Design a protein with these regions (language model features):
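Short alpha-helical donor nucleotide-sugar binding micro-motif in glycosyltransferases
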Residues: 88, 288-289, 296-301
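Donor nucleotide-sugar binding/catalytic pocket of nucleotide-sugar-dependent glycosyltransferases
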Residues: 129, 148-224
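Nucleotide-activated donor-binding/catalytic signature segment of Leloir-type glycosyltransferases, i.e.
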Residues: 271-292
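Short hydrophobic beta-strand element within catalytic cores of glycosyltransferases
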Residues: 318, 327-330, 340
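Conserved acidic donor-binding segment of nucleotide-sugar-dependent glycosyltransferases
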Residues: 342-343, 347-354, 363-368
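A short, well-ordered alpha-helix in the C-terminal region of glycosyltransferases
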Residues: 356, 363, 370-385, 391-397
């Protein structure tokens, strides 16, 4: 009890005190980056002594349900609401951290937390709350047709989610319903955007700026820096159109032997990459490599190429590159432009501009002194932004900010008055 007679929670006097956190995630049929981040952050919080409760669902649980039931559950899953509310009543966590609710869990859980007066933090791993496809990308181009619209009808018309109007309609109905109910602004205490760019997009989409924090993803372990003596450029990732594979190959037709290119990855555009590798001596397709070998090639590479033509969420490959001291030549677009600092930790070029990429690579090959400095600066960015220790401090600061706001609201309610 303080001098003013008001109670204080333990974390207000000791910021390192252990908290009880309920972490919520709807995992994907094919494990991806969001699933990995969910697991990493759970382990990180537990390693600092916090108690982390888990509520998880999987898309596998949707098997056998008819379309109408799936649509209803995507908008409001009453079972999730009941289960989460019972769990919160039993365990009384101090905070609920949501990673993904789509499609099985649904936004009903925000209301369960609100009824129990427990603040909610939501990590924005993608753009799903702005776009039915979650990517802001359609037909090979950035698309913002649904951005800021209460009813995202363009997405349904184009069948943006999995190429299906019916599947897209489920996500669009969820967005329209909760836009109307003002769920995003009234039932979530704070959002975590992964980059400054993503934060700006959510503000543009109508999210309250004061609730939007920025916390990037991080690496669990430090791979340690390399020396970059391999004299080659490197691409690592899925071989898909939105990753800019066409731009990459076209640029190397211009570059020729000035700087060899190694491509590590597989995917739908593998035949085009294989053909280019056979036709150009300077291009080598490595197919998909084990993690340890990819890291070693990153340590030896001169520069990483990231020519994506969509906004990206948070490309972990950039954090990994910076960790080994590898600068990045990236599209001047979306999150890539937020993370890669032009002429400090890499270079930018206009997305889709193969000639611009070729010019950036030629500049790179001709300026070894400048690029050596960029290697050191890339490593410095990793140490100050993308380590587990830095990420933990950022996460706890966000939690504490949310909890302090929650306490302030409690104290603002006069004695005997009801809390709305």
């Amino acid at each position: 009890m303080e001098a003013d007679g008001q109670p204080r929670r333990p974390w207000q006097t000791d910021p390192l005190i252990q908290m009880k956190i309920l972490s919520v995630h709807n995992s994907y049929q094919k494990p991806g980056g969001e699933d990995q981040v969910f697991a990493q952050e759970t382990d990180l919080l537990r390693s600092y002594g916090h108690e982390v409760l888990l509520y998880q669902s999987s898309n596998d649980q949707l098997a056998g349900k008819n379309a109408l039931l799936l649509l209803g559950d995507t908008i409001w899953n009453q079972q999730s609401y009941r289960e989460l509310r019972a769990l919160m009543q039993r365990e009384r966590p101090e905070i609920v951290h949501v990673h993904n609710t789509f499609p099985a869990i649904s936004p009903s859980i925000y209301y369960a937390a609100k009824e129990e007066e427990i603040p909610v933090v939501q990590t924005l791993h993608n753009y799903r709350m702005l776009c039915p496809a979650a990517t802001l990308f359609r037909d090979g181009h950035v698309c913002e047709d649904c951005l800021g619209k209460r009813v995202p009808w363009p997405g349904v018309m184009h069948g943006c989610y999995r190429g299906s109007r019916l599947a897209t309609a489920a996500g669009a109905a969820m967005l329209a319903t909760h836009n109307y109910k003002q769920t995003w602004s009234k039932s979530v205490s704070a959002y975590i955007a992964l980059t400054d760019f993503a934060r700006s997009k959510f503000i543009q989409g109508g999210f309250p700026p004061e609730k939007l924090f920025v916390k990037p993803n991080y690496l669990q372990t430090d791979p340690m820096p390399g020396e970059g003596k391999g004299n080659y450029a490197l691409f690592v990732g899925r071989l898909t159109p939105e990753k800019g594979i066409g731009t990459l190959l076209e640029a190397w037709r211009e570059i020729g032997r000035e700087l060899p290119l190694q491509i590590a990855g597989d995917g739908p555009m593998a035949p085009e990459v294989e053909k280019a590798s056979g036709a150009m001596e300077s291009v080598t397709w490595l197919k998909w490599l084990p993690r340890a070998e990819i890291l070693q090639r990153m340590k030896d590479a001169s520069v990483l190429i990231l020519p994506s033509t969509w906004y990206e969420g948070f490309p972990m490959i950039i954090a990994e590159a910076f960790a080994v001291g590898l600068p990045v030549i990236a599209s001047k677009l979306g999150s890539m432009a937020s993370i890669v600092d032009h002429q400090r930790t890499g270079l930018h070029f206009e997305a889709g501009d193969a000639i611009g990429l070729a010019e950036a690579v030629r500049w790179w090959a001709a300026h070894p002194a400048e690029t050596a400095l960029m290697r050191a600066q890339a490593r410095s960015d990793y140490e100050t932004k993308y380590t587990a220790e830095v990420n933990y401090a950022q996460m706890i600061n966000i939690y504490e900010s949310v909890l302090k706001r929650s306490v302030s609201k409690e104290l603002a309610v006069p004695a005997g008055a009801s809390k709305l």
